């Protein structure tokens, strides 16, 4: 399969218009197929925020599964979305996609040995809390974040303890508020 015929790479590189025309050429998509399972992650790596949102939405509308774990590094679509700097994102537009990913089963508590938890990736994004506010609103409305997961085996710090110590302006307060509301774990 040529690279641009591979769903992941097509979703990652193409404009929405080009991707849609290519995608419409398929009678049916087998979302269990390894190549198609990765297409949503490819869409979330598209360099254009507008194309990213449109392609991801198209794939979700047609049955893409946000709960897929990408086996290379045990990551999911949240790890992929929570990457990059504010210059690469339209957080307001992408917040709608984020909500669909979470509602569709993307695991906010999935640990990658290489990249950690999705919320660790969100904390590491090169964007201000003001930029990230739309993402925070979606994430902290969820009842299923496990703040008790140990993220540092040396110190024994949990996710909640780590995020409360974040140098960010707003995130520590949001985490404290969330932990009070859910007793630290509500999965």
Q: Can you say where each PLM-predicted feature lies in the sequence?
A:
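Intrinsically disordered, low-complexity segments enriched in glycine and mixed charged residues
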Residues: 16-17, 34, 106
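Ankyrin-repeat-protein effector appendages
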Residues: 2-6, 104, 127-187
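Alpha-helix capping and inter-helical loop/turn segments
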Residues: 47-50, 64, 101, 127-130
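Ankyrin-repeat boundary/"N-cap" motif
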Residues: 2-10, 30-46, 68-87, 111-126, ...
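Short helix-adjacent coil turns
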Residues: 10-19
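Ankyrin repeat domain, specifically the short helix-to-loop turn at the C-terminus of the second helix
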Residues: 20-28, 54-65, 95-108, 135-147, ...
């Amino acid at each position: 399969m040529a690279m641009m015929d591979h769903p992941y790479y097509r979703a990652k590189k193409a404009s929405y218009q080009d991707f849609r025309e290519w995608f419409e050429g398929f009678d049916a998509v087998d979302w269990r197929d390894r190549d198609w399972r990765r297409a949503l992650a490819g869409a979330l790596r598209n360099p254009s925020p507008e194309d990213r949102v449109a392609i991801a939405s198209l794939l979700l509308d047609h049955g893409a599964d946000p709960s897929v774990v990408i086996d290379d590094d045990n990551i999911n679509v949240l790890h992929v979305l929570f990457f990059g700097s504010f210059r690469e994102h339209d957080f307001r537009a992408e917040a709608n996609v984020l909500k669909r990913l979470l509602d569709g089963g993307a695991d906010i508590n999935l640990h990658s040995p290489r990249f950690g938890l999705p919320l660790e990736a969100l904390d590491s994004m090169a964007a201000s809390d003001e930029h990230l506010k739309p993402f925070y609103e979606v994430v902290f409305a969820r009842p299923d974040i496990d703040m008790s997961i140990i993220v540092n085996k040396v110190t024994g710090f949990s996710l909640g303890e780590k995020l409360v110590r974040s140098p960010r302006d707003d995130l520590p307060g949001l985490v404290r508020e969330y932990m009070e509301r859910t007793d630290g774990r509500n999965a």
